[in-house]
Amino acid sequence: MTKTLPKDFIFGGATAAYQAEGATHTDGKGPVAWDKYLEDNYWYTAEPASDFYNRYPVDLKLAEEYGVNGIRISIAWSRIFPTGYGQVNAKGVEFYHNLFAECHKRHVEPFVTLHHFDTPEALHSNGDFLNRENIEHFVDYAAFCFEEFPEVNYWTTFNEIGPIGDGQYLVGKFPPGIQYDLAKVFQSHHNMMVSHARAVKLYKDKGYKGEIGVVHALPTKYPLDHENPADVRAAELEDIIHNKFILDATYLGRYSAETMEGVNHILSVNGGSLDLREEDFTALEAAKDLNDFLGINYYMSDWMEAFDGETEIIHNGKGKKGSSKYQIKGVGRRVAPDYVPRTDWDWIIYPQGLYDQIMRVKKDYPNYKKIYITENGLGYKDEFVDNTVYDDGRIDYVKQHLEILSDAIADGANVKGYFIWSLMDVFSWSNGYEKRYGLFYVDFETQERYPKKSAHWYKKVAETQIID
């Protein structure tokens, strides 16, 4: 049976400042930690990315032509405050006013994120969100943006608090490149959630007319053997690290006893302690019912089995299937069942996981209000032929996930929109330029845009709301 989506459903495309804009040192933009980190550790940089800084009118015209009526954009903090605080960079402010005006001209609603992995270098080198001063700087930055950009109707505080902590302190593929420090992971998550809560409370106290929420990456975690209590426990602990800790902070305003028991177990095995203060929980409690929406970024699920041994994580950054490894001492090991397909980067393709995660939020956090799927898509080594890409695999991937959303809505979940990652091809943090996600192919040499087969398909779905 052909499935449909509601008439008011947003069919969006997602971007991020550092992955799309280029112009990393242009017009007074301050440095971010990624600038030097990429030069020192990778075979690519964020120049020119998709040159969105100059070519956003082209991308927004394409969005309008192809039925994309929402766009995720992030503001580069260091374009507004080059050192994270203090002096405002007027040219950066002007750029975003112009960008948002173009969005509205093209009838593409901007959903604007304040922080998408790109803390200014001056703050990052001073501990990033492990340093509590950063909470104050972030709230000041948020306050400035809320006041300066009244044309923005949808605000997101952070993109993917979970993967930031994981990337910086667990996997070690984000600057500062620290591995296996679970205490820093949880402390980073916590301090960023406090920052989120304080920004949300400020937004509501000021009476701004728009909406505000947060974007969490929520990869669903399953036990490899549902009958094995040790595997079930491994999945529960892995879920606490990546999902439950931050969801509790968002919607409970505290960490449940079950969550803290898991956190304490993980830290007892791996070392370290947390600094959780009374005023933190006052802030979390004050914001827990103020989130207008939850953004869910969903790409994959994981299966966990019990594991006794040392932590080892190997990141597959070059698309060599089967080269990744993930096992955490005292938690478990990721082992995918043979029947589940995966990408060349070992990302597990499992649309049912999205349904299960949405229903988990609905059940466990009934004060969630509404959900947008703020990222979902397929990274591919696209073959560019005949000025296009015949990306049937991407179409199939997106189709399956949209059908899941139709099911979730039918079963009572309030899902209001979907943003494909990504609108056009962008640079990928730890994979460079080979891993493409866009509806529009970008020739990174010429910066020309070419609609892929998926763009034509997405346009039809957006126009008809029929998933075909």
Swiss-Prot record:
- The positions annotated for binding D-galactose 6-phosphate are Q19, H116, N159, E160, N297, S428, W429, K435, Y437
Q: Which family does it belong to?
A: Belongs to the glycosyl hydrolase 1 family.
| GO BP annotation list | carbohydrate catabolic process; lactose catabolic process via tagatose-6-phosphate
The EC class name is hydrolase
Q: Which HAMAP family match?
A: LacG
**Catalytic activities:** a 6-phospho-beta-D-galactoside + H2O = D-galactose 6-phosphate + an alcohol
Q: Name one Pfam family in it.
A: Glyco_hydro_1
Q: Looking at the record's lineage, which domain of life comes first? A: Bacteria
Which key words are in the record?
Glycosidase, Hydrolase
Q: What is its EC number?
A: 3.2.1.85
Annotated GO CC locations: cytosol
Please give the name of this protein. Answer: 6-phospho-beta-galactosidase 2
Q: Where is the active site?
A: E160 (proton donor), E375 (nucleophile)
Q: Output the Gene Ontology terms for molecular function.
A: 6-phospho-beta-galactosidase activity; beta-glucosidase activity
Q: In which pathway does it act?
A: Carbohydrate metabolism; lactose degradation; D-galactose 6-phosphate and beta-D-glucose from lactose 6-phosphate: step 1/1
